[in-house]
């Protein structure tokens, strides 16, 4: 049963939501901070945390999975090569 499995859909279709999250995460990884609405930020947080967890793994497969989610190779390479050291000791809540 899928009761209470509802995630916030932001009032848009699936493709629009995926593109929105990819663009917001690209901006966040590139600039370090962004200005957005509270609802979008609440949906973006677990999305970006999963990408950072992939970066902590550091394998080629993890890099490809992150590129498929964020859809920007430069932002992902910056995360995997430079920024991941900030998050090595943290277990979450980046």
Across the structure, where does each feature detected by a protein language model lie?
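Structured, basic alpha/beta domains of bacterial-type, RNA-associated proteins
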Residues: 1-12, 16-19, 23-94
């Amino acid at each position: 049963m899928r009761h209470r499995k509802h995630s916030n859909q932001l009032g848009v279709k699936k493709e629009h939501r995926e593109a929105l999250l990819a663009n917001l995460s690209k901006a966040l990884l590139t600039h370090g901070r962004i200005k957005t609405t509270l609802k979008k930020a609440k949906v973006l947080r677990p999305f970006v945390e999963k990408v950072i967890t992939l970066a902590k793994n550091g394998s080629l497969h993890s890099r490809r999975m992150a590129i498929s989610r964020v859809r920007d190779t430069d932002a992902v390479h910056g995360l995997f090569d430079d920024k991941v050291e900030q998050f090595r000791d943290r277990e979450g809540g980046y």
